[in-house]
């Protein structure tokens, strides 16, 4: 099995106590985009308790693995994925496209609880939790 790139939704689900449906693989990675989304969640928390929960999630993610960066390979993968979605007459979801592009460029599967990644299934293996 290839490495699993965990989408932001996996960490939000764990934070909220939602089941993932299966155990996570031993080899996991995260995108720097997921780190940014989780940091935004901390900054936008409506109250101190929510902020504390979100900060704990962010710290857990940072301890899990170094975030995969957005580099030239990821940029090329992003352009390919976004052009495919646009050619089909749909508007790509920017953050999800970056996460899928990170997976594509790094030979990883996207593990997610979101249905938003179906646009990329022809190019990137998607594991829906």
Predicted feature locations:
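Active-site neighborhoods of divalent-metal-dependent phosphate/nucleic-acid chemistry enzymes
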Residues: 65-111
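Acidic, PIN/NYN-like endoribonuclease modules and their adjacent C-terminal/linker elements
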Residues: 100, 104-129
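Histidine- and aromatic-rich ligand-binding microenvironments
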Residues: 7, 31, 91-93, 114
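Short, well-structured N-terminal submotif of metal-dependent ribonuclease cores
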Residues: 1-34, 40-59
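Residue-level signal for well-ordered alpha-helical positions
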Residues: 17-18, 41-45, 81, 88, ...
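Phosphate- and divalent-cation-binding pockets in alpha/beta enzyme and binding domains
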Residues: 37, 77, 119-120
């Amino acid at each position: 099995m290839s490495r699993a790139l965990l989408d932001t939704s996996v960490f939000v689900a764990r934070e909220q106590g939602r089941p993932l449906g299966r155990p996570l693989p031993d080899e996991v990675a995260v995108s720097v985009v997921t780190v940014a989304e989780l940091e935004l969640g901390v900054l936008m928390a409506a109250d101190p308790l929510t902020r504390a929960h979100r900060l704990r999630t962010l710290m857990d993610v940072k301890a899990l693995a170094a975030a995969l960066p957005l580099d030239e390979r990821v940029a090329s993968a992003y352009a390919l994925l976004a052009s495919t979605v646009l050619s089909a007459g749909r508007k790509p979801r920017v953050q999800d496209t970056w996460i899928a592009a990170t997976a594509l460029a790094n030979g990883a599967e996207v593990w997610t609880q979101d249905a938003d990644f179906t646009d990329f299934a022809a190019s990137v293996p998607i594991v829906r939790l």
